[in-house]
Amino acid sequence: MTSILKSVLLATIIVNLSSVKALADVTSQQVWDGLRTAMTASGFKITASETRKGDRLTIGDLQMNRRVQDPGSDASGTISLSVSSLQFLDKGDGTVTIVLPDQIPVILHVNSPEDGDFDVQFDLTQRNLVIRASGKPDEIRHDYAAEAVGLDLRKLVLDRTEVPGADVHADLSLVNVSGTSISAIQTDRNYTQNLNIGRMSYKASISLPGPS
């Protein structure tokens, strides 16, 4: 269980930072369409509402769901993210700013032949995250930076029994995160990623009752 949980937590942070395939010098609608296309290509099924006001496009009640598989075992399941509001702002200088909420709830459900079924609820958090898109339609550059990005465990359910909060603690923290992603359209769409992490820490403590 620890293996798939740790890998999914880290992958969730990286996917949400690096898969923002935005387009500059185009409309906010095209920026959102690019993000939605990239997330769909990553395996997510997406539903959301759209509201426009001036240069601001707001995506409300964004729900993202995809299947996950632990490559080291037979464990598989689903991961769901719920984003209350995602905003795209045209800065008027050929760049687009993407604004994410400070906290995004994530739910992971796993079926494991070895460990049984379990559900994990945690929050994807960020502090002072800035995402800026620029470039041209056939070569898109997006830069991002944050003081911190993390995942905090909120609930753990094993075989339909919730583990008391006092008995389970887990978090993953990335400090001083920055990076660049360039999307170039040639015959296919190619991505070049550069992710810098000042410090990463992961800790977990789980106390489970023994058999009665």
Feature-to-residue mapping (PLM):
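Sec/Tat signal peptide C-region and signal peptidase I cleavage site
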Residues: 19-24
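Glycine-rich, small/hydroxylated-residue low-complexity segments
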Residues: 26-212
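Bacterial N-terminal signal peptides
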Residues: 8-18
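Bacterial N-terminal signal peptides that target proteins for export
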Residues: 1-9
